[in-house]
Amino acid sequence: AKGGPTPSIAVLQDLDAEDTGFGCFWGEVQSNIHKGLGGVGVITDGGIRDIPDWADGFNALAGSIVPSHAHVHLAGFGQTVRIAGMVVKSGDIIHADQHGAVVVPEEAIAKIPAACDLLQRKEAVILDLAKAPGFTFEKLKEAIAKQDEIH
């Protein structure tokens, strides 16, 4: 958000225990407020609503989509939260996309490009064969063995 690290992602834990996602904090209003403050998205185990009316380009990963906001209130800010098993502290670096989210340890950031390159090269061995005519289980076993030679 403006005045803080950017881009920023709001991370909101729903504290309603067995009723998580019954109502929601996030909809048209919150998406516009947070985008206006420099935010790029929200991650919550709670519900979201009003999706067609959200701020353009504002992203969300949520536990559910619901029709109403119900009774919501903020219980704290800048605290450690737990979202679907992921523990997030204020200031953590998060990678998120349509598949989910993960906290990235600061010491791992510099290693990410090399790890992605290695993974891509290893997967290419199998993908190229799997997409080619005549792919068999035997060819898959050969590809897996070739993967082990890539470093």
Could you say what each language-model-derived stretch is?
Residues A1-S90, V104-H151:
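Feature captures the catalytic cores and cofactor-binding loops of soluble hydro-lyases/lyases
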